[in-house]
A protein has these predicted regions:
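Nucleotide-activated chemistry modules centered on ATP-dependent adenylation/adenylyltransferase
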Residues: 1-99
Length: 99
């Protein structure tokens, strides 16, 4: 999840992550926590961090539609393209319909 997901997906909100972490601790005998380190940063910031870690984004998947290649048109494909562009990272992803 990332900062932009909060209004769209209730399970990406900090309150949900905190509640799930509390439930995991209450329901186990272990010291279990759920961490969501990217909850309050942008997708572009996440992409920059990934680049620092050496992530090859052509080897990652975002598309909701599945298939052999990214569709290039669904919301996650568009967010991916925007985040990589904002982060200054060349997008080498193969898209069926490039934006």
């Amino acid at each position: 999840n990332h900062g932009g997901d909060h209004t769209i997906y209730p399970d990406c909100r900090p309150a949900f992550v905190d509640a799930m972490s509390a439930a995991a601790q209450a329901g186990t005998f272990e010291d279990v926590t759920i961490e969501a380190p990217y909850t309050n940063i942008t997708k572009a910031d996440i992409a920059r961090h990934g680049k620092q870690l050496g992530i090859d984004y052509s080897e990652t998947w975002s598309c909701y539609k599945g298939g052999e290649v990214h569709c290039g048109q669904c919301g996650t494909c568009r967010e991916r393209q925007e985040a990589l562009r904002e982060a200054g990272i060349a997008d080498t992803t193969e898209y069926e319909n490039p934006a």
